[in-house]
């Protein structure tokens, strides 16, 4: 059951989504400390465990590092062909690396591939310095963007995801961040499907082992530290639907792969997503007092999708909550009522 606000549809606003929760569909039994599965089109949570608990994100931090790099490219503050110098500090970055040489020049395109495919901490550092001048200033940008996205359980201390006090996120926040990358930067999202990258004559393979194993999986990012455990945020598209899954502290590389696969299969096999209303559909005529017209049409400003368990679409019911007449003047785009979605019985 869910409530969603109706708006006066003649003003373009963000499209609305709905969630219809049905406890009769049991999620797979996973050992991961936290997990989350979301249908991207309807923004519906299909399975979750500890999704709002603050966790150490490890290299999933690099989702935000990449996001800010994509934003800089979009704003033409960077270009993929631009070459930047590798600092001594970046070269000394511990952990996973793309094996940059200090003082050498490297293109932004190669840095992005090293960041995404090889999870290079050195690549993250060079990108941070190229965008903000220093990693410290880049972290300020990361946290500012997290606040703008309303990632309420996220705080960054570095651009790499190396363990640090007060460096944390949550499964829900990371899925929201990944969703924004997919929606805003489709031309760069394709980098997450690369299975191999060769730099400095060293070939490294994408640690997301679902790539190639499941033809529907086309990204996104792994993470690991001793304290964070094995993490994987994955996304797949099948029959026009896109799902995003995340597992935190799965126990092993093999486990994070298999548990992510279980989540994605569960979402595709047990649920369907359909359009309930199209943009501009008149859902209801709202009475208006003391206006130039006695009624105003109300609906959703964007296509309105609903995800339901397989076989239950015909049982779905949409009811308007009791609404009082509006008093003119009425502001276009204002929320004017609630739509309740339920199943019969």
Report residues per predicted region.
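Sec-dependent signal peptide recognition
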Residues: 1-8
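Sterically constrained small-residue positions within well-ordered secondary structures
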Residues: 9, 26-28, 48, 236, ...
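Short amphipathic alpha-helical leader/targeting segments
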Residues: 13, 57, 79-83, 129, ...
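Compositionally biased, intrinsically disordered/low-complexity regions enriched for serine, proline
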Residues: 12, 24-25, 306
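Domain-terminus/edge residues, biased toward the C-terminal soluble/receptor-binding domains
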Residues: 151-155, 163-168, 172-345
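Hydrophobic h-region of N-terminal signal peptides that target proteins for export
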Residues: 9-19
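Active-site-adjacent loops and short helices of periplasmic peptidoglycan-processing enzymes
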Residues: 18-184, 196-200
